[in-house]
Amino acid sequence: MRFLLLIGIFIAVAASPSEGYRRCPRFWVPYRLSCYRVFSYLKTWQEAESFCSSSRSSGSRGHLVSIGSGAENRFVVTLWRTSHGVLAWRNTYWIGLKRSGHSWRWSDGSTRYRYTNWGTGEPNNHRRREDCANQFNEHDNYHKWNDNSCSTRLSFVCET
């Protein structure tokens, strides 16, 4: 009987997510305490945010990805580059950063806008029409962020 109890405890521990990571539904990828998924659909920033908000992972409502560190930024870039369904030439995708007045805010409401990774000269609000942020992954701006028109249609990464 004690042996069966030990086996049960071992299975429960082995089946639980690793410390610092959470279980994610099929097609979602865990990183630390969140789940991430790449979508190749082309949507405006608001359409992508709404799509992510309608996605649920482990009961949590999703948002466009919020990037709080260099390590998380590299994780998202790697996830993007290794995802099926993303065309090789499509190098930009929405992240959850949007201009609000004179400052930038994450769509999930988090206040972790301490880490930034803007490309050279960005954000520049070109023609005063660039209020949403995308990740740009080619040439000199690899891993960098760019402000873009929110009506541009890009692929996107959701996080829950």
Regions found by a protein language model. Give the residues of each.
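Extracellular, disulfide-bonded carbohydrate-recognition/adhesion ectodomains
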Residues: 1-160
